């Protein structure tokens, strides 16, 4: 299950607003994060920075974390906002200090890094009572868009994994092709 990375040759598809917002709008993401204007937030699996651009308008700093330098190259070509810093790292091994982040989110990339080590790392770098938003492709979806269903997680498996890592899952919504979770650190 999971742990593939998105093909950088198809990176332009990640900038299709109609397609991306169909599954998670900027308003829903920012509303779930509820950031202060000086918040420090991480976009985990940021790709070309589609959602980082949105969130950057509402916070002090966004760390756009991606394992692929090629994705950061696409983001640089597009133009990186002044308050966004590109970080090349595995989610299981980020360069952040303990309790460094006010919030984190992952949009359609949870299946690429989901593991006990990665979730423990996310928990480590988030402050007490910080929000973690997970929007990803559901194994209950058709697989006609996004990764194949065998690369996806179910909402229930994702909830269990977050709870096992010390998160309190406050909301878990199942949708046609995706699920969205809102969790907090305990």
What are these regions (language model features)?
Residues 117-131:
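A short glycine-rich, Lys/Arg-flanked "PGG" loop and its adjoining helix->strand segment in the class I
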Residues 10-30:
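Conserved SAM-binding loop and adjacent beta-strand
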Residues 92-103:
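A short acidic, Gly/Pro-enriched loop at the edge of an enzyme's catalytic core
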Residues 102-116:
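A short SAM/SAH-binding and catalytic strip from SAM-dependent methyltransferases
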Residues 1-12:
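N-terminal, positively charged/glycine-rich alpha-helical extensions of SAM-dependent methyltransferases
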Residues 13-17, 131-182:
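C-terminal alpha-helical "lid/dimerization" subdomain adjacent to the S-adenosyl-L-methionine
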Residues 30-36, 94-95:
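Glycine-rich helix-loop-beta junction characteristic of Rossmann-like nucleotide cofactor-binding loops
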Residues 42, 47-94:
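Class I SAM-dependent methyltransferase SAM/SAH-binding core
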């Amino acid at each position: 299950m999971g742990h593939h990375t998105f093909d950088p040759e198809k990176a332009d598809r990640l900038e299709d607003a109609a397609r991306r917002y169909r599954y998670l709008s900027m308003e829903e993401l920012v509303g779930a994060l509820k950031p202060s204007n000086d918040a420090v937030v991480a976009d985990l699996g940021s790709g070309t920075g589609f959602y980082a651009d949105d969130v950057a308008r509402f916070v002090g700093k966004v760390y756009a974390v991606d394992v692929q330098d090629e994705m950061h190259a696409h983001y640089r070509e597009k133009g990186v906002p002044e308050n966004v810093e590109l970080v090349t790292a595995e989610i299981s091994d980020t360069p952040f200090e303990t309790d460094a982040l006010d919030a984190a989110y992952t949009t359609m990339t949870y299946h690429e890094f989901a593991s006990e080590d990665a979730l423990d790392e996310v928990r480590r770098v988030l402050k007490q009572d910080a929000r973690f938003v997970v929007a990803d492709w559901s194994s209950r979806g058709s697989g006609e868009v996004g990764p194949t269903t065998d690369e996806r997680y179910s909402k229930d498996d994702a909830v269990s994994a977050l709870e096992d890592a010390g998160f309190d899952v406050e909301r878990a919504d199942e949708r046609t092709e995706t699920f969205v979770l809102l969790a907090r650190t305990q």
